[in-house]
Amino acid sequence: MLRRKVIFTVLATLVMTSLTIVDNTAFAATNLNTTESTFSKEVLSTQKTYSAFNTQAAPKTITSNEIGVNGGYDYELWKDYGNTSMTLKNGGAFSCQWSNIGNALFRKGKKFNDTQTYKQLGNISVNYDCNYQPYGNSYLCVYGWTSSPLVEYYIVDSWGSWRPPGGTSKGTITVDGGIYDIYETTRINQPSIQGNTTFKQYWSVRRTKRTSGTISVSKHFAAWESKGMPLGKMHETAFNIEGYQSSGKADVNSMSINIGK
């Protein structure tokens, strides 16, 4: 009887030890699977973060005439001759510099399809912040075209050595915390979006310079029309840095064009 009891006790101990080993092995396996799962999630999370980072395009620098799309905006660098450089950044941001030029412009904006008026598109405004350093004749502005009638337009917030444009005065508009003088000029047989032809230029020129803020584009349009300066179907609205027989540089830290808001 004693021998059987000893044997039973030994067997029970072996069984319990075996169960403990099995349980520990299962626990270790569970921990391993959990660790692997956690590690896999961390790797996937890292991959997603890396992928999201890569969706932001690296800055692109161009030095000669080029048009294209970058950061959700149409862009253009144009010059007749001289040294130019434009670095395209995320969104509406860009930087530029120029020297020994005849005429050069750097811009980002929105192109339309010449089928709607500004009223049909909805309210248009531009928000921007720029470090602008011109040396000579230059201006910082909203720029664009309409068709039918063909009109080239400028809303100038800052300039270099010369305050444009020296045309026919059409009055003023007070908007966005400042007074703008309104002018109209005529260009005869000059380059345009429709080739060399004759067309009107409309200008709003701020009396006091600034290099950041909001430009309520549609309010300028309405003021022009109230003064007998009709606009046609929208072709383009852009934020523009332009130089003429000058040098300079500009860093457009941020720029956005809001339509229908």
Swiss-Prot record:
Keywords: Carbohydrate metabolism, Glycosidase, Hydrolase, Polysaccharide degradation, Signal, Xylan degradation. Residues 61-255 form the GH11 domain. Pathway: Glycan degradation; xylan degradation. Its EC number is 3.2.1.8. GO terms for biological process: xylan catabolic process. Residues 1-28 form the signal peptide. This is Endo-1,4-beta-xylanase. It comes from Clostridium saccharobutylicum.
